[in-house]
């Protein structure tokens, strides 16, 4: 009985450590295990000009965590790049995003589906790579001309962990 109480109290404490992380410049919020993320900004040249690629990352320090990392990326396309009525262009962009993410890690796409964040189109997908030992779960959204990419990476044996879904599902743009 004592071990059951200890287990339940441990689970409760673990659940309580998740905190809200907000980026006012990035106009998003997400839950992370500690409420902390570090930001890096990289300039990238595209066919539409230079963009600032923002990466927010949390990497657990514990041994054998549910997820190896939690990431939110965003960047802004020039104003008007994706008119709201350009459904085909937005769908093509989302498909290309998924394909490029698979190609970037020489992985295998195991799942993908269309999703929405309020009225904004998005995608969810999973990629296995590194001899199918590692899994990346991703969501992306296009909010106006801002692109968000939310990802977690884990070992395959941890692929069903609740932390990945908690992180991905908590994302909100504001």
Predicted regions: what they are:
Residues 20-22, 29-60, 94-141:
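Signature of long, low-cysteine stretches enriched in small and polar/charged residues
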Residues 55-92, 149-150:
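A short acidic-to-branched-hydrophobic micro-motif
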Residues 63-67, 120, 140-148:
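Short, solvent-exposed coil/turn segments at beta-strand boundaries
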Residues 11-19:
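Bacterial Sec-dependent signal peptides at the C-terminal "C-region" and cleavage site
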Residues 24, 34-37, 90-105, 144-174:
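Surface-exposed amphipathic alpha-helical segments
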Residues 76, 129, 153-154:
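Short beta-strand segments enriched in hydrophobic/aromatic residues
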Residues 41-43, 50-51, 81-84, 159-164:
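A short, polar/proline- and glycine-enriched secondary-structure boundary/capping micro-motif
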Residues 3-12:
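Sec-dependent N-terminal signal peptides
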């Amino acid at each position: 009985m004592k071990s059951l109480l200890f287990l339940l109290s441990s689970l409760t404490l673990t659940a309580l450590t998740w905190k809200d992380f907000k980026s006012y410049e990035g106009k998003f919020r997400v839950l992370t295990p500690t409420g902390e993320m570090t930001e890096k900004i990289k300039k990238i040249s595209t066919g539409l000009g230079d963009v600032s690629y923002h990466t927010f990352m949390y990497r657990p320090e514990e041994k054998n965590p549910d997820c190896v990392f939690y990431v939110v990326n965003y960047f802004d396309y020039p104003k008007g790049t994706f008119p709201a009525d350009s459904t085909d262009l937005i769908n093509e962009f989302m498909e290309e995003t998924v394909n490029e993410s698979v190609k970037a890690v020489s992985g295998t796409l195991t799942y993908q589906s269309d999703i929405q964040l309020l009225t904004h189109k998005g995608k969810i997908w999973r990629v296995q790579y590194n001899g199918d030992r590692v899994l990346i779960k991703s969501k992306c959204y296009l909010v106006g001309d801002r692109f968000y990419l939310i990802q977690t990476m884990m070992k395959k044996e941890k692929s069903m962990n609740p932390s990945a879904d908690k992180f991905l599902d908590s994302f909100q743009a504001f």
